Structures are given as C-alpha cells and as structure tokens.
C-alpha cells in the first residue's frame, strides 16, 4: 500500500511535467520565441480558460451527489485560509505584484487536475460523483478569489470601481457566469456548440502547461527564491496540515476526506501562472510556484495520503 500511494501521487503529476518539459524543448529549439509565448499565453487567457470555466459548469447536475456538510466545510475552510494568507503575505512582502502572486500560489490548488485521479485511484471511478460536484463548487470560488486578488494587487492604489470593473470584465469570470446561467436556466446548446466548447476546454490545461514550460527561466528562480520557499511551505505543508486536521476532527472520512486532500494538499493551480502574467502580477514567481509545487507534491501528497491511510481514516 505504501508503494501504491506513492504511485498515485506520481501518476497524477507526471503528465504535467512531461508536457512542461515539451514546452522547455520547444523554446530551446527556437520553435517559439518570447513574444510568441506571451501572445499564446494571452490567447489561452482570453479564449481557452473561459471555455474551460463554462464547460466545468455546463450540464452539471449539482444535486445528485451533493454533500452539503462537506461543501460548507470546504468553503468555510477556504475562506479562512484565504484571509489568513492575505494577512500573512501583507506582513512578509512589500511588493504589490509579488503579493498577488504569493497569495494565489498559497491558497489556490490544482484541484481540477489532481482531484479526479487521486479519488479514482484510491476508491475507483464509480466513487467520483462527490468529488466532481465539489469541483463545480470550489473551482469557481478559487477563480473569483484569484481575479479579485490580482486585480487589487496590480500595483498602485486602484479605486474600488476600477477593481470591480476589472473583475466583471475578466474572461474567466464571464465564462463561469455563463456556465452558471446555463445550469440555472437549463439551457441546452446544440451538439456542434457543445463539441466546440468541449474541444476548447480540453485544450486549455495542456496548452497552459506547454507555455509554462516554454516561458520557464531557471535564472529567474534566484530572484524569487525567498518568496518561492514561503509559497511552497504554505501550499504543500501549512495549508494541508490545518485543513486536513480540521477535516479529521470534523468527522470526515473516506471519499470526503480524500476529496479534502485533493482540495487543500494539491500543488498550485496551473492557471495561476497565466492569470498572473496577464494581470500584471509576478509571472516568474507564479510560474516557479506551479513547477516546484508540482514537483514536490509527489512527496508531500504521498505523505498526507499515507498518514491518513495509516490512521485508518479511509
């Protein structure tokens, strides 16, 4: 079982690293230059991520496997962690742009990519309904908080109206709102439209990983080393330690507890890099957080899964 848990963690993140490595190769071979990387990244932000947000919500029936107690706990814990992260980062970092990237890197996990593989590998694909429903609840909150955070910490002192306008015009927010409207109004798109949105949504994560690899510069790590260590410690150790301890004390077990592992112990969300770069935050720090948190999460997620399994909690 020890080896099985390690394999689960590695298999969940290995494809991400392979695609990022392809991005590094593409850039090194000169197939794409720095300006093209930025243009493609903007296309991902404006076209692919909104399609992904819409597709994550469109056609979903939230009531089938909805666990109100788990949802309330996860949302409440996320709110508490977000507030604590903001307070902490404001104390340890003075740069506005770095603040936004750090807050996002610590609170915002890669739940979409990590959640399904982890639960499926431990409990089987027949037990994915609860996790899938939680994705439709937690991921939009992740994204709204990210837009709010990066808009506020763009630099200077923006007016509240400017911040609100930036949030409302954000492509990911627009995609999420359209998805929620489609669910609320029971709108059924024609098959060709569903297929088109689905294709764009499916391209979002691999393209983001490819461009992340293409934009990665090992020399930039030295500049962001201090903040990178802070973010990795928060994302992979502090946040899961607090959230999972509270989850165990609250009585969550089995699929519900492993879903909390996926929410709070996963590495930093891939889309945080694209958003940071496109919203004038510290893109180098955000990219480094995605890469290194994904790397170290093979060990830390294995540790959390093994510890919970050893205590017979699932």
Indicate where each model-derived feature is located.
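Alpha-helical transmembrane segments of multi-pass small-molecule/ion transporters
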Residues: 1-314
């Amino acid at each position: 079982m020890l080896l099985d848990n390690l394999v689960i963690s590695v298999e969940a993140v290995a494809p991400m690293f392979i695609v990022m490595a392809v991005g590094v190769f593409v850039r090194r071979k000169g197939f794409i230059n720095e300006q093209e990387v930025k243009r493609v990244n903007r296309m991902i932000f404006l076209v692919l991520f909104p399609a992904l947000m819409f597709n994550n919500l469109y056609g979903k029936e939230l009531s089938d496997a909805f666990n109100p107690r788990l949802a309330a706990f996860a949302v409440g814990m996320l709110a508490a962690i977000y507030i604590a992260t903001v307070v902490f980062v404001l104390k340890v970092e003075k740069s506005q742009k770095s603040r936004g990237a750090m807050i996002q890197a610590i609170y915002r996990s890669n739940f979409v990519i990590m959640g399904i593989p982890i639960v499926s590998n431990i409990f089987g694909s027949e037990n994915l309904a609860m996790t899938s429903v939680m994705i439709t609840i937690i991921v939009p909150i992740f994204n709204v908080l990210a837009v709010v955070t990066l808009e506020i910490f763009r630099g200077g002192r923006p007016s509240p109206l400017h911040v609100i306008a930036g949030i409302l015009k954000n492509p990911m927010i627009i995609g999420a709102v359209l998805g929620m409207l489609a669910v609320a109004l029971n709108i059924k798109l024609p098959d060709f439209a569903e297929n088109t949105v689905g294709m764009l949504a499916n391209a979002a994560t691999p393209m983001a990983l490819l461009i992340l690899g293409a934009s990665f510069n090992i020399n930039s790590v030295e500049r962001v080393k201090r903040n990178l260590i802070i973010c990795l410690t928060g994302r992979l150790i502090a946040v899961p330690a607090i959230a999972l301890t509270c989850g165990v004390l609250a009585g969550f077990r089995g699929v519900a507890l492993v879903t909390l592992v996926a929410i709070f112990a996963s590495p930093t969300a891939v889309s945080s890099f694209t958003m940071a770069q496109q919203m004038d935050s510290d893109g180098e720090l955000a990219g480094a957080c995605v890469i290194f948190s994904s790397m170290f999460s093979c060990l830390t997620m294995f540790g959390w899964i093994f510890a919970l399994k050893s205590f017979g909690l699932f």
